[in-house]
Amino acid sequence: MGWGWILLFAAGCAEIIFALSLKLNEGFTRLWPSIVTMISGGGSFYLLMMAIKTLPLGTAYAVWTGMGAVGVAVLGIFLFKESADWWRLASISLIVLGIVGLKLTDIE
């Protein structure tokens, strides 16, 4: 796995933190969650920008958004008691399958 994929993974993690902190900052009325939102959002975009220097743009963007969607959906189930019905879990599984498929197309 090259640096591009490592940076993309870090960007995806920062994206998950960004999205979760959006919920916690309550419209930017809470200081620390608001600071985390700004830092993680900026960091996520910066890391994505660095990753697309070596990865195909379409692949990198799809993986980044997919990671964010899956991470937030799964953590939403555990942290915010969001629905975990079988349709939602099946949909999350399809996103994961798509991410794996995109990674497999970039084998060096």
Residue ranges and their predicted role:
Residues 1-108:
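Polytopic alpha-helical membrane proteins, predominantly small-molecule transporters/carriers
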